[in-house]
């Protein structure tokens, strides 16, 4: 069984495309909480309200980091998606963390981001532009079969 952590942007259905495409493979997927409000507010919901947004955000970030660290540590493969909009600092951090742990890293982004992400891409074992390519990488890793 291959354990795959899906990190990165939360505004498109790329995760669902990969999970659906890999449903016939022996893969278990995990990832961050993708409900933006729940992710932002988990700290204060669990540990209590804060009057200052800095501490509100810090509590959430730290609890989310526990989940992220465990997910990446447990994974055999980490896929990090950089989407078309927003500054995706969390995705970049997750990619660096996974690389530092020696995880097999697949980066997913459009050609428009190739220059900006060249160092991140250089740390990856594969750089894909479509979720279907990630599925085919997983299929090849598990079965040795080409598309």
Model-derived features: where do they sit?
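Conserved catalytic or regulatory cores that recognize and/or transform ribose-phosphate-containing ligands
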Residues: 1-147
């Amino acid at each position: 069984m291959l354990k795959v952590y899906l990190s990165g942007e939360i505004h498109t259905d790329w995760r669902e495309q990969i999970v659906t495409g890999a449903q016939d493979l022996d893969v278990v997927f995990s990832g961050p909480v993708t409900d933006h409000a729940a992710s932002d507010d988990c700290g204060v919901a669990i540990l209590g309200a804060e009057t200052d947004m800095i501490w509100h955000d810090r509590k959430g970030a730290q609890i989310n980091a526990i989940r992220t660290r465990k997910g990446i540590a447990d994974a055999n493969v980490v896929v990090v998606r950089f989407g078309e909009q927003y500054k995706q600092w969390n995705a970049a951090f997750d990619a660096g963390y996974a690389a530092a742990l020696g995880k097999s890293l697949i980066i997913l982004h459009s050609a428009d981001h190739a220059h900006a992400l060249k160092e991140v891409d250089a740390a990856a074992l594969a750089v894909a532009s479509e979720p279907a390519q990630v599925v085919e990488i997983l299929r090849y890793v598990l079965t040795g079969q080409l598309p």
